[in-house]
């Protein structure tokens, strides 16, 4: 009986660490953290992935109620959250780009309630949905889980992990929030700016025409038309953002 209890305690102490890292990743990654993936599904997925990775390596037995155990809890949460945050940058870039497009079209007040992001413009929500479909089409969910499981070999549990290079990489990659949003929105914003300038010139030349009465619906229609015409290039840019995110995730793990 005592031998059985000792084996159960040892199993708990070894399974705890990979499960903490996997759970932290699932809570912060863009696809697995959405409201459609319920807490039960996330817990079940975390347990399943933990059992998958358990036979692949020799796990250290660390008591979580010691100083070393508390440090290890912090490190596993840090690694899981960091890997999820690297992917979350892509969705943040899409929201920034969607907000810029909505403001140019005059739809900045047309918001939707997103359970993960709060109030976001409808254009941004549309881009996030497209991004999720592209992510699944690229097989990103499989690649991300593979990288997560590989992280246990590259960033082993029980060893000291240098946090500074990982934080610097995250800060460097977070610049893509604004750069990626600008790459997505700039063609449409430039076209709408030219239309706005044209309307302003017409209004200045003939004030009696009252161009602003039709200017607002015209800007919305032009914005929708430009968005539809730009969807192929936007799709390629979203695909490029995901591919860059996978590369950065590999750099964080030391693969690239």
Residue spans for each PLM region:
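Hydrophobic alpha-helical segments and their helix-loop boundaries in membrane
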Residues: 1-256
């Amino acid at each position: 009986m005592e031998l059985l209890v000792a084996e159960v305690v040892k199993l708990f102490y070894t399974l705890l660490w990979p499960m903490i890292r996997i759970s932290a990743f699932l809570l912060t990654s863009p696809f697995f953290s959405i409201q459609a993936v319920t807490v039960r599904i996330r817990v079940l997925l975390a347990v399943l992935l933990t059992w998958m990775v358990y036979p692949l390596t020799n796990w250290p037995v660390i008591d979580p109620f010691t100083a070393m155990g508390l440090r290890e809890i912090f490190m596993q949460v840090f690694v899981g959250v960091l890997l999820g945050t690297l992917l979350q940058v892509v969705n943040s870039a899409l929201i920034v780009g969607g907000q810029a497009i909505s403001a140019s079209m005059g739809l900045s007040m047309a918001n939707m309630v997103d359970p993960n992001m709060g109030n976001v413009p409808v254009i941004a929500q549309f881009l996030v949905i497209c991004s999720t479909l592209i992510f699944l089409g690229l097989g990103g969910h499989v690649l991300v889980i593979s990288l997560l499981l590989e992280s246990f070999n590259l960033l082993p549990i029980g060893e000291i992990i240098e946090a500074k290079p990982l934080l610097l990489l995250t800060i460097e990659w977070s610049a893509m929030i604004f750069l990626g949003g600008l790459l997505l929105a700039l063609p449409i914003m430039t076209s709408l700016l030219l239309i706005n300038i044209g309307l302003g010139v017409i209004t200045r030349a003939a004030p009696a025409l009252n161009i602003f009465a039709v200017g607002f619906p015209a800007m919305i229609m032009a914005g929708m038309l430009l968005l539809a015409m730009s969807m192929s290039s936007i799709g390629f840019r979203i695909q490029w953002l995901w591919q860059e995110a996978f590369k950065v995730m590999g750099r964080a793990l030391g693969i690239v």
